[in-house]
């Protein structure tokens, strides 16, 4: 005679915990903890142990996903940037090409000014940038993972301007883009002056005078 199956208890009938949701919650807590700590104590004093304690997770949870605090901070900062893009709208970020190079570069630099003045970005990005000046490995990672995608967009837009006859063909776009962004970065990082739309608009006007066909 077959043995009847016991009715499931109330406890066994409960759905299993969603490990994906739990992992995402832990990951988000680690991002927040890493960004908060690098602002509060600086990059050198930020540790995996400190991040874990702040996030309420074990060290092994962090080491399961990342190999170093630099990796944690890079991913946390990239995630912060992705959040900003989602808030801005559904369209993926791209350098505008309206046919007016000056207007397009001014538009992008104004958005950069907004981001640099956003408290969510300013403190952690300043801490990472300052450490990248003295920590060559971190500096290279900052350029490769955070800056290079944006630099490539500038290069592409300047090449399009060359094709349209707006920029001299012998100009190296990789060098030319620094006319726009390097003065802004220095002023922001070293507090040598205020950053504003007027400032970046002027940078564009001056730079394009030197890049235009003669």
Can you describe what each PLM-predicted range is?
Residues 1-17, 103, 107-108, 148, ...:
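C-terminal peripheral helix-coil segments that are non-catalytic and often amphipathic
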Residues 89-122:
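Hydrophobic alpha-helical connector segments
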């Amino acid at each position: 005679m077959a043995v009847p199956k016991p009715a499931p208890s109330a406890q066994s009938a409960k759905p299993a915990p969603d490990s994906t949701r739990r992992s995402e919650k832990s990951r988000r807590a680690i991002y927040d903890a890493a960004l908060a700590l690098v602002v509060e104590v600086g990059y050198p004093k930020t540790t995996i142990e400190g991040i874990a304690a702040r996030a309420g997770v074990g060290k092994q949870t962090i080491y399961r996903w990342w190999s170093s605090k630099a990796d944690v901070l890079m991913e946390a900062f990239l995630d912060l940037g992705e959040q900003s893009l989602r808030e801005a709208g559904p369209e993926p970020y791209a350098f505008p090409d309206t046919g007016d190079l000056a207007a397009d570069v001014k538009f992008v630099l104004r958005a950069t000014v907004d981001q640099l003045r956003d408290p969510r970005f300013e403190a952690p990005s300043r801490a990472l940038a300052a450490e990248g000046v003295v920590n060559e490995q971190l500096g290279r990672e900052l350029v490769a993972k955070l800056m290079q995608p944006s630099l490539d967009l500038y290069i592409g837009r300047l090449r399009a301007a060359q094709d349209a006859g707006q920029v001299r063909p012998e100009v190296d776009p990789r060098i030319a883009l620094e006319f726009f962004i390097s003065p802004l970065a220095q002023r922001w990082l070293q507090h040598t002056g205020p950053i504003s739309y007027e400032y970046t608009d002027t940078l564009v006007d001056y730079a394009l005078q030197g890049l235009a066909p003669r």
